[in-house]
Amino acid sequence: MFKSTLAAMAAVFALSALSPAAMAAKGDPHVLLTTSAGNIELELDKQKAPVSVQNFVDYVNSGFYNNTTFHRVIPGFMIQGGGFTEQMQQKKPNPPIKNEADNGLRNTRGTIAMARTADKDSATSQFFINVADNAFLDHGQRDFGYAVFGKVVKGMDVADKISQVPTHDVGPYQNVPSKPVVILSAKVLP
């Protein structure tokens, strides 16, 4: 009886030692992007960007991102993907989501954010990984901003490599990699 009481007290003490932030972060999903340039592992912040994270995870789980490309890459800025095939055919996304750019997360190097049009609530499937600090994309800097919803935890060297590939224009699209950089698969890690 003494052993079980002691074990229970130790468990309660251990749980109380964890901060709420640490407990929340423990449940944040990780997503692996397997690309033709290497792997990128993302940690998504479901506490600060629940709508964007759920949206991204839904696209991942449906297989939407498989065989899409990083269709816009700009050195010293970002790499954008999640919407086009290798033939630059746009995939049909789900309806747009609410912009969560006011969540306190910043567009710093290594973060992932939702791409959108000039309409603040127009983000669908496309996302970008910042390869530099891009404070001008943050909430309130020039407009509502671009919603950060996670960060690269492994493979930032791959994102940097992708940002340096040669590009050209394809019809109305600029900064398209000359040789497609393909997201072969995207999956939520256990």
From Swiss-Prot:
Keyword Signal in record: yes
Disulfide bonds, paired cysteine numbers: none
EC number(s) recorded for this UniProt protein: 5.2.1.8
Catalytic activity: [protein]-peptidylproline (omega=180) = [protein]-peptidylproline (omega=0)
Any one Pfam family match given in the protein's UniProt record, by short name: Pro_isomerase
InterPro entries, sorted: Cyclophilin-like_dom_sf, Cyclophilin-type_PPIase_CS, Cyclophilin-type_PPIase_dom, E_coli_cyclophilin_A-like
Coiled coil: none
EC primary class: isomerase
Compartment annotation: Periplasm
SUPFAM superfamilies from the UniProt entry: Cyclophilin-like (SSF50891)
GO molecular function list: peptidyl-prolyl cis-trans isomerase activity
Domain of life, per lineage: Bacteria
Signal peptide: 1-24
UniProt GO cellular component terms: outer membrane-bounded periplasmic space; periplasmic space
Regulation: Inhibition by cyclosporin A with a Ki of 25 to 50 mu-mol, a concentration 1000-fold higher than that required for eukaryotic PPIases.
GO biological process assignments: protein folding
UniProt key word ATP-binding: no
Residue stretches making up the PPIase cyclophilin-type domain: 27-188
Keywords from the named record: Isomerase, Periplasm, Rotamase, Signal
Family the entry assigns: Belongs to the cyclophilin-type PPIase family.
Task of the protein: PPIases accelerate the folding of proteins. It catalyzes the cis-trans isomerization of proline imidic peptide bonds in oligopeptides.
Protein name (Swiss-Prot/TrEMBL): Peptidyl-prolyl cis-trans isomerase A
Gene of this entry: ppiA
